[in-house]
Amino acid sequence: MKKKVGLMQRNHVKLISMDTIPIEAVKWLLYPFIPLGKITILQGDPGEGKTTLVLQIIAALTTGKPVWEGAPPMEPVNVIYQTAEDGLSDTIKPRLVAAGADCARVMVIDDFDRVLTLDDDRLEQAIEQTGARLVVLDPIQGYIGASVDMHRANEIRPLMYRIAKLAEKYGCAILLIGHMNKNSGEKSSYRGLGSIDFQAAARSVLVVGRIKDDPTLRVVCPAKSSLAPEGGAVAFRLDPEKGFQWAGPYDISVDELLSGSSRGHKLREAQSFLKEVLADGPLPQTEIEAAAQQAGIRPKTLRNARYELGVTSTKISKQWLWALPE
């Protein structure tokens, strides 16, 4: 018996009883897309508006404004934003100013003398020093380190584990922006560059793409949501004259977005339907929705069409009436 006990002592393993683990609710920076204390990946093809989208979100977070209409306001937060592609003075700063950001709350780790990588101690030091609630690395390919093969799971896994622990320790959201590969026929989970361990470590994966039938319209669509019901896609416009504009919910899946099979024709059908039924004046919302269902128009598509047309909704005698804009 003594021999067995001695053997057990020599091979002692530190164990944690689940009985000692407190139950905590997931906290969110932007529900249901960006959880706090976790890794989120935002990916898309070059030129699809990933950086512009993130800077718009940063502007709202640093000023405490709702990110989009209907999102709850919050206290202004500090952000760490690292870019390996764009100039700070001629690109990032002007975009932040245009978006209305509080630039005093946006910090950049000075890596002029030494390139920043995922296993760099300066990353944790900066989070601790600033109390940042959001850390952005844009793009992730620029921060894995020259000696790391991003296609090898055994090299990527410890890096992702480390930053996941950083996010958990400091309760901040770490957002990794990445380009996608050119395998257009693959599922969304296999279109991110490098090892699948990137996406495996993330609790939320978002994809940005453009709508084929509308060159100014982009959509951010959830590809993975481990901590909340998968939210619907949200659209935004990058207009040469008006700049960035949120365009509301959009009825499309991530695989449809990546394959280019836009639902633009269904949206146009829904728009034509609304124009026809409302041509003679306002009608009750319930009546319109029932007629749309009979016509095979999905609720999300009807909602998108209503938003695009600017259909108004007015409550009269305990019912909502829809009407075309004057």
Segment roles from a protein language model:
Residues 53, 57:
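Hydrophobic positions on the alpha1 helix immediately C-terminal to the Walker A/P-loop
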Residues 36-40, 77:
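Pre-Walker A (Motif I) flank of P-loop NTPase domains
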